[in-house]
Structures are given as C-alpha cells and as structure tokens.
C-alpha cells in the first residue's frame, strides 16, 4: 500500500495544486471519484495493463467510456496516467486528493463503523469527540456492522480507534493465546 502512495503522491499533489489554482476542486473531486469507481472493476484493470492493447487505442476507448464525467483538463491527466502505465493508481490519487481537500477546507473525513444506527445525539457527541481528537471538524461517514456487537471503530487520517466489543474480544483472545 505504501508503494502505491509513493507512486501516486506526485500526481495527487500536482492535480490538487492545479485544481486549487483553477478553482475547480469540486469538479476534479467528482471526476477522480468516478475514475476510481471505473478502475475498481477488475476487467478495466486488466485492460489498462494489457501490453497487447495499444495505449492510444485504450486511451481513446477509455475516454469515450468516461464521456460526460471527465473535465477538459482531466483528459490530459488520463492520457498522462495511461501513457505511463499508472492508470491503476487513480483510486489512490482520488483518496489523496480527498485528504488534501479536507485539510485545505479544515475538516477530516472519519469512517465510523458502529454496531447499530446512530441517533442524532450520538452523532453530535461523536463529532465533538472527533474535533477534540483530530483538532479539526469531522465529516462522519457512518456504516453499520452488526459483527462489532457493540461500540464503535473510528478511522481518520491514518489513525484507528477500536472501541468495539468485537475488537476487545479479539485483543483478549490474542493475549490468551500468547
């Protein structure tokens, strides 16, 4: 994973800088998220890395497939990635772009996994906790995973807090087996 981050970072930094200067951060974010979804498909990954397929032909077909979702500046970006065999990095680039944007706008994206749906008061309390923990406002992305039994898992900015019963049981089992 860190190798992907190392390879993707220069692209993500350059794209974010260009988007910021052009004032079209939202358009870039939307396009990158779309490209991330397209490249998540295993068939697309294979096609992008197939040495038998001509790069120019692949790029033309890829751009045609993405028509309506790619901003004008994005076409050159896609051509650059595809020509350098780096189109598979677009998911990592999209994630890094989102992190840069969050930092620029003064918030942090937080993945919240709970054992049950949160009530509004719990979400408010969690937001306050995240703001104290990360020294920035949190934008919560809540998912429910009943296997946690109870509690919550928070993932933000490379940090993880596992306050779930499932996590506690796993840690206990690990200690007992050692």
UniProtKB/Swiss-Prot annotation:
Transmembrane intervals: none
Coiled coil: none
Subcellular location: Cell inner membrane
GO molecular function: proton-transporting ATP synthase activity, rotational mechanism
Alphabetical keyword list: ATP synthesis, Cell inner membrane, Cell membrane, CF(1), Hydrogen ion transport, Ion transport, Membrane, Transport
Entry membrane topology: Peripheral membrane protein
GO cellular component, one term: plasma membrane
Pfam families: OSCP
Main location: membrane
Family note: Belongs to the ATPase delta chain family.
Function recorded in the entry: F(1)F(0) ATP synthase produces ATP from ADP in the presence of a proton or sodium gradient. F-type ATPases consist of two structural domains, F(1) containing the extramembraneous catalytic core and F(0) containing the membrane proton channel, linked together by a central stalk and a peripheral stalk. During catalysis, ATP synthesis in the catalytic domain of F(1) is coupled via a rotary mechanism of the central stalk subunits to proton translocation. This protein is part of the stalk that links CF(0) to CF(1). It either transmits conformational changes from CF(0) to CF(1) or is implicated in proton conduction.
Subunit structure: F-type ATPases have 2 components, F(1) - the catalytic core - and F(0) - the membrane proton channel. F(1) has five subunits: alpha(3), beta(3), gamma(1), delta(1), epsilon(1). F(0) has three main subunits: a(1), b(2) and c(10-14). The alpha and beta chains form an alternating ring which encloses part of the gamma chain. F(1) is attached to F(0) by a central stalk formed by the gamma and epsilon chains, while a peripheral stalk is formed by the delta and b chains.
Protein name stated in the entry: ATP synthase subunit delta
Species classification: Bacteria, Pseudomonadati, Pseudomonadota, Gammaproteobacteria, Methylococcales
Gene: atpH
């Amino acid at each position: 994973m860190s190798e992907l981050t190392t390879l993707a970072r220069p692209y993500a930094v350059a794209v974010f800088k260009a988007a910021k200067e052009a004032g079209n951060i939202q358009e870039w974010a939307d396009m990158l998220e779309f490209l991330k979804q397209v490249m998540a498909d295993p068939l697309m990954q294979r096609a992008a890395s197939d040495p038998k397929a001509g790069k120019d032909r692949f790029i033309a077909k890829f751009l045609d497939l993405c028509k309506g979702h790619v901003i004008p500046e994005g076409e050159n970006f896609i051509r650059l990635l595809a020509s350098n065999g780096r189109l598979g990095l677009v998911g990592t680039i999209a994630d890094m772009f989102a992190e840069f944007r969050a930092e620029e706008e003064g918030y942090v994206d937080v993945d919240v996994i709970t054992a049950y749906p949160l009530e509004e008061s719990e979400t408010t309390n969690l937001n306050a906790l995240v703001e104290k923990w990360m020294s920035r406002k949190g934008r919560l992305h809540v998912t429910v995973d009943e296997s946690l039994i109870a509690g919550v898992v928070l993932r933000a900015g490379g940090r993880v807090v596992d306050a779930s019963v499932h996590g506690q049981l796993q840690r206990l089992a690990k200690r007992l087996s050692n």
